[in-house]
Swiss-Prot record, chain A:
Compartment(s) of residence: Cell inner membrane
Chain ranges of the ABC transporter domain: 3-237
Superkingdom per UniProt: Bacteria
Gene: cysA
Topology within the bilayer: Peripheral membrane protein
Organism: Mesorhizobium japonicum (strain LMG 29417 / CECT 9101 / MAFF 303099)
Keyword check for Secreted: no
Protein name per its UniProtKB record: Sulfate/thiosulfate import ATP-binding protein CysA
Lineage: Bacteria, Pseudomonadati, Pseudomonadota, Alphaproteobacteria, Hyphomicrobiales
PROSITE patterns xref list: ABC_TRANSPORTER_1, ABC_TRANSPORTER_2, CYSA
């Protein structure tokens, strides 16, 4: 089922949580909503589910306007961060709940509901736990029961709010791979919220980066990482360093020296240069480069991360050096960014 | 830790590393013995001096049986009424924000504080055939004051806060997400309340019921004013005990008291077992 969010605005007591957000989700896609807390990602997810009503704008499921439908009619599967399982029901009863509350002829017979529940338990690899109560399960198992419960109603869309947020790192990684498998097998259109970029980039077909109630960028992991379209995305996704620079005659200047990068299409004047610390070319001499003194140096896994003080302003930037590089305290290092991007100074 | 025996036989479950288990357990036992156990065993001992035949004669006396039936029956009915409306009051107080909510909240506790005799007299005045409410009920043929129905009304008044105050905190802890989850799964409002919310509240409701019930069985002050106290019809067991005392018939008084004690204990024990069972299941 395609989902289209059209110019949605949401205010909570006059405070805007989302400004004019539009998003197209293709059928069968796995989409991540990524952003820091307060960016509106959970609000957007809850609007799609119908747990909140938009102040303005519409949400379409396929060609149908879903914004006027109640939560019950929307037929979405929602998985909550803290699972929200029904404590007084067994695992099987939890999973069958959505079918049991149906009315009249749309309610399958009890036998069928039981069969469906154990089928879903097989799918989430928890066969044999039908009779357990949620209190008797581990966090990862509860999360899987919550997912099975959401899938039992054959939802048009599957929505997950920080699905792995409350689990430890090991279980998270496992469940992540497993969710991808389930998605590939069942083909539900799936939207999940996360603040963990690794999770978003690894798992999703497309990532929606959000900040302060707006969508900053939508794209594949490659798009988002390699060509961020705003300073926020550059800073939020992956490591980045930035320097205040000036653009004159299509050349980039740091203080009073050109650094050997040309930007013929950039507007003249103050700007900020962004680059990845690991994507730099080290130089020996320095005519047209960035040079600085090493202020601090740390060993990070396979590389060495150094902080350089640049120019009279003592601007600090981080770059990565090979472990064997002789740069020690106070020594000078010259480099030029490989892939970089300029954004006009705010 | 000199009080925790480590020898053979059964052992205490190893308490936490925080010291004080021996002291606090010892104090609790001593305190409960002094406050509850000694007075009650005195009661049993006194009634035991009767001998079986005499005890049985008192226990099987029509008047005693009727009084016990009225006491336990009305207390049960009143507790049942309180469970329904007490839960409703708690729901309103927890779920809705309205002007005067704090005042209503405070009002719930009034039956705790008010002298029971005052409550009894006030209720009698209202429900008497010429009282404000009694006057309205009279043409319908409903007589409240001076009947068992009046006893139920008094016990409902006395027992309400027990239900509200036990259910309210548990209701406040209900996770919003659980309701939302049920809604996304297609459950309507009624189904959410009956299938998701109330089963979770059941242990608290049972506790509230047993407290209101226990209070109702023992209630004296408010009931004697409204009950009319007709032997065999609207005479409660506690009153019968007082009557026997006034006749200096101490053995009979203690015998009735011992029967009440035994019945109450059994009922509260059953309620407790139900609680433990449901807690074990739902964790």
């Amino acid at each position: 089922m395609e989902v289209r969010v059209a110019n949605v605005r949401k205010e909570f007591e006059r405070f805007p949580a989302l400004h004019d957000v539009s998003l197209d989700i293709k059928s069968g896609e796995l989409i991540a909503l990524l952003g820091p807390s307060g960016s509106g990602k959970t609000t957007l997810l809850r609007l799609i589910a119908g747990l909140e009503r938009p102040t303005r704008g519409k949400i379409f499921f396929g060609d149908e306007d879903a914004s006027q439908k109640s939560i019950q009619e929307r037929n979405v599967g929602f998985v909550f961060q803290h699972y929200a399982l029904f404590r007084h029901m067994t695992v099987a009863d939890n999973i069958g709940f959505g079918l049991k509350v149906r009315h009249g002829s749309s309610r399958p017979p009890a036998q069928e509901i039981r069969r469906r529940a154990s089928e879903l338990l097989d799918l989430v690899q928890l066969s044999g736990l039908e009779k357990r109560y949620p209190a008797q399960l581990s966090g990862g198992q509860r999360q899987r029961v919550a997912l099975a419960r959401a899938m039992a109603i054959e939802p048009k869309v599957l929505l997950l709010d920080e699905p792995f947020g409350a689990l430890d790192a090991q279980v998270r990684r496992e469940l992540r791979r497993w969710l991808r498998e389930i998605h590939d097998r069942t083909g539900h259109t799936t939207v999940f919220v996360t603040h963990d970029q690794e999770e978003a980039l690894e798992l999703a077909d497309r990532v929606v980066v959000m900040s302060q109630g707006r969508i900053e960028q939508v794209g594949t992991a490659d798009d988002i990482y390699d060509t961020p379209n705003s300073p926020f995305v550059y800073g939020f996704i992956g490591e980045s360093s930035s320097l205040p620079v000036k653009v004159e005659n299509g050349e980039i200047w740091l203080a009073d020296r050109p650094i050997g990068l040309s930007a013929p299409h950039a507007p003249e004047g103050e700007a900020t240069l962004y680059f990845r610390p690991h994507d730099v070319e080290l130089l020996d001499g320095c005519s047209g480069c960035i040079a600085g003194t090493v202020a601090a140096s740390r060993r990070v896994a396979g590389t060495r991360r150094v902080e350089l003080e640049i120019g009279g302003e003592r601007q600090r930037v981080e770059i990565e050096l090979p472990v064997g590089h002789p740069a020690a305290q106070k020594s000078r290092v010259a480099f030029r960014p490989g892939r970089w991007k300029l954004f006009p100074a705010a | 830790m000199t009080t925790a025996p480590a020898q053979a036989g059964w052992r205490f479950r190893q308490p936490s590393v925080i010291p004080g288990f021996g002291l606090t357990l010892g104090f609790s036992l001593a305190y409960l013995t002094l406050i509850i156990l000694i007075p009650l065993s005195g009661l049993i001992w006194r009634s035991a001096s009767l001998g079986w035949a005499e005890f049985w004669a008192i226990a099987s006396d029509r008047r005693t049986i009727n009084a016990l039936e009225i006491s336990f029956g009305t207390a049960f009915l009143a507790a049942a009424v309180n469970v329904v409306f007490g839960t409703l009051v708690a729901w309103v107080l927890v779920r809705y924000r309205f002007p005067g909510r704090r005042i209503v909240d405070a009002m719930v506790d009034l039956p705790f504080a008010l002298p029971t005799a005052v409550a009894g007299i006030a209720l009698t005045t209202l429900y008497a055939p010429n009282g404000w409410i009694g006057k309205l009920l009279m043409p319908l043929g409903v007589k409240v004051a001076y009947t068992p129905l009046g006893i139920v009304v008094a016990l409902v008044f006395i027992g309400l806060p027990f239900v509200v105050r036990t259910v309210q905190p548990i209701m406040e802890e209900i996770d919003r997400e659980v309701e939302e989850a049920a809604a996304t799964l297609g459950a309507n409002r009624f189904q959410i309340i009956t299938r998701v919310l109330f089963p979770g509240l059941a242990p608290a409701i049972i506790t509230g019921f047993s407290l209101a019930f226990a209070r109702g069985v023992g209630e004296y002050g408010s009931v004697i004013f409204i009950a009319g106290n007709l032997p065999y019809k609207s005479e409660i067991a506690p009153l019968l005990i007082v009557i026997r005392l006034e006749e200096y018939n101490y053995p009979a008084a203690t015998a009735i008291a011992a029967i009440m004690l035994a019945l109450s204990f059994v009922m509260l024990l059953v309620v407790n077992l139900v609680q433990t069972w449901s807690r074990k299941r739902y964790g």
